[in-house]
Curated annotation (Swiss-Prot):
InterPro entries: Herpes_TAF50
Signal peptide: none
Job description of the protein: Immediate-early transcription factor that controls the initiation of viral lytic gene expression and lytic reactivation from latency. Triggers lytic replication, and initiates a cellular senescence program in epithelial cells. Up-regulates human DCR3/TNFRSF6B by directly binding to its receptor. Globally induces a proteasome-dependent loss of SUMOylated proteins in the host cell and the loss of promeylocytic leukemia nuclear bodies. Improves the stability of the triplex capsid protein TRX1 by reducing the ubiquitination level of the latter.
Location relative to the cell: Host nucleus; Virion tegument
Record protein name field: Replication and transcription activator
Pfam families: Herpes_TAF50 (PF03326)
Subunit structure of this chain's protein: Interacts with human ATF7IP protein, leading to promote and regulate host genes in virus-infected cells. Interacts with RNA polymerase III complex; this interaction downregulates small RNA transcription and 5'-pppRNA production.
Length: 605
């Protein structure tokens, strides 16, 4: 069977001599798989080591600051080609040489190294205050996505997946080279790329192909199998399709106990820009519609709002029956219990949607009972007529039992109304009754804290202060005040509202407008003060970290002549600074793409 030449054209920036050696090596490897030659006669393992060494030397000579990424991609492509040619043979012909047995372990090492460098490119850029260009960041994100998806399939054929990884890597290198020629890359970004994109360590990569007797690379299958059995193993992944006895071996790069990493502060930026993003939103949007919309930011908060106790029923089901009459006379009647349950569901569905205040009423008494005298003699509230006059001008619902934009709130049967939760106020004596005022449910003595954006001056204030500032004017407050109306006591009648004062009631959407206005004032006053304090050196804990070694490296590069060739040998002090970064072996396997995507513009790519 002829060698598969699909991936030979995907290598990055190789000389014709290296391409010729590479083609000869792949042909000899296929002949070994066909049992035309032996692995020891053509020295497959030693030639594989030399070709990987040539990839690294070529990347150091012509790859500039991102040569480590180029070398990693070329090595990954080379071992993927060997892997694809091996699995195309029959089982009895494959697995008789050292490279075929150790290929899954080497592939795991290379993919792990590729994921590490791409993760560090996104994670450590904010902590070092490095701005990633949009086109480079988008191309790097595609490379990271393909690499992470294929990390679950170490023992599978890479075929098309190999081509996707190499195509994404080629786009990254092309964008870097083009922007470097146009002078669009700063010296700080170049130093950051040289720090992040490290070269693979060939000694660790070929550790499974070293003979335990001689200490050199070997093609003896028995020595390789004996060495693999001594390596630590991991549990099989459920995503691995074709499992083998070497697919669970961990590379040595993941088992390093000696910490060589330099302390680099990891600070995910974006908290400072969160206020600006929130200020850009429309401040006049309806607070109620945003809360109940399916795609809004209050959608996850509706579960707690729907489970609030209804203002038309007591918190304890048996409290009213104990006061009004004999609770044991008809408590066992199943028909009456179903009627009460349906009435409670209907009352709870109507309560949070009414736009005008209503009087408190008791539930219908059971058959054979008499209504409570205290509730029967309660006079009609005088402020209901004023509310009806206002509702005639601006109707919201044609009928309270048929809302126009909200479905009825359903609740499972068997759950008592006195259940407690994290967002539910605990029942207390004299304050268990809640009222509905201007469409908002106000529970006494506790309320649900409204949403305030991070950084808002109301975010860390107490609940009464966050709901409304301390009034300093007269008793009748103007429109726009956030002070909630006084809640009447349970036994006292509510104060009357005249038609002249009905237009002075607060707007439920005014709270959002006030929050946006406060954020804008904070952006005009607080943010410039923070920038001035950071410039003077008076930094707080919320400010970016102080200038580190990378800024020192940038200052050193900028102080040199403009015609400095970065490919030439550097000065001793510059080499000392670079060694501090290149020894960093920080294996960060946590994906934080959101930091990189926040500055991307996919329309440019």
């Amino acid at each position: 069977m002829r060698p598969k030449k699909d991936g030979l054209e995907d290598f990055l920036r190789l000389t014709p001599e290296i391409k010729k050696q590479l083609g000869s090596l792949v042909s000899d490897y296929c002949n070994v798989l066909n049992k035309e030659f032996t692995a020891g006669s053509v020295e497959i393992t030693l030639r594989s080591y030399k070709i990987c060494k040539a990839f690294i030397n070529e990347a150091k000579a012509h790859g500039r600051e991102w040569g480590g990424l180029m070398a990693t991609l070329n090595i990954c492509n080379f071992w993927a080609i060997l892997r694809n040619n091996r699995v195309r043979r029959r089982a009895e012909n494959a697995g008789n040489d050292a490279c075929s047995i150790a290929c899954p372990i080497v592939m795991r090492y290379v993919l792990d190294h590729l994921i590490v460098v791409t993760d560090r490119f996104f994670i450590q850029a904010p902590s070092n205050r490095v701005m990633i260009p949009a086109t480079i960041g988008t191309a790097m994100y595609k490379l990271l996505k393909h690499s992470r998806v294929r990390a679950y399939t170490y023992s599978k054929v890479l075929g098309v997946d190999r081509a996707a990884i190499m195509a994404s890597g080629k786009q990254v290198v092309e964008h870097l080279n083009r922007m470097e020629k146009e002078g669009l890359l700063s010296s700080k970004f170049k130093a950051f790329c040289k720090w992040v994109f490290t070269y693979p360590v060939l000694e660790e990569m070929f550790q499974t192909m070293v003979s335990s007797k001689t200490g050199h690379l070997t093609d003896d299958v028995k020595d390789v199998r004996a060495l693999i059995k001594t390596l630590p193993r991991a549990s099989y992944s459920s995503h691995a399709g074709q499992r083998s006895y070497v697919s669970g071996v961990l590379p040595a790069c993941l088992l390093s106990t000696k910490s060589k990493a330099v302390e680099t502060p990891i600070l995910v930026s974006g908290a400072d820009r969160m206020d600006e993003e929130l200020m850009g939103n429309d401040g006049g949007a309806s607070h109620t519609e945003a809360r109940y919309s399916e795609s809004g930011q209050f959608h996850a908060f509706t579960d707690e709002l729907e489970s609030l106790p209804s203002p038309t029923m007591p918190l304890k089901p048996g409290a009213q029956s104990a006061d009004c009459g004999d609770s044991s006379s008809s408590s066992s009647d199943s028909g009456n219990s179903d009627t009460e349950q349906s009435e409670r569901e209907e009352a709870r569905a109507e309560a949070p949607r009414l736009r005008a205040p209503k009087s408190r009423r008791t539930s219908r008494p059971n058959r054979g009972q008499t209504p409570c005298p205290s509730n029967a003699e309660e006079p009609e509230q005088p402020w209901i007529a004023a509310v009806h006059q206002e509702s005639d001008e601006r109707p919201i619902f044609p009928h309270p039992s048929k809302p126009t934009f909200l479905p009825p709130v359903k609740r499972k049967k068997g759950l008592r109304d006195s259940r407690e939760g994290m967002f539910l106020p605990k029942p207390e004596a004299g304050s268990a009754i809640s009222d509905v005022f201007e469409g908002r449910e106000v529970c006494q003595p506790k309320r649900i804290r409204p949403f305030h954006p991070p950084g808002s001056p109301w975010a860390n204030r107490p609940l009464p202060a966050s709901l409304a500032p301390t009034p300093t004017g007269p008793v009748h407050e103007p429109v726009g005040s956030l002070t909630p109306a006084p809640v009447p006591k349970p036994l006292d009648p509510a104060p009357a509202v005249t038609p002249e004062a009905s237009h002075l009631l607060e707007d439920p959407d005014e709270e959002t407008s006030q929050a946006v206005k406060a954020l804008r004032e904070m952006a005009d006053t607080v943010i410039p003060q923070k920038e001035e304090a950071a410039i003077c050196g008076q930094m707080d804990l919320n400010h970016p970290p102080p200038r580190g070694h990378l800024d020192e490296l940038t200052t050193t590069l900028e102080s040199m002549t403009e015609d400095l060739n970065l490919d030439s040998p550097l000065t001793p002090e510059l080499n000392e600074i670079l060694d501090t970064f290149l020894n960093d072996e920080c294996l960060l396997h946590a994906m934080h793409i959101s930091t990189g995507l926040s500055i991307f513009d996919t329309s440019l790519f």
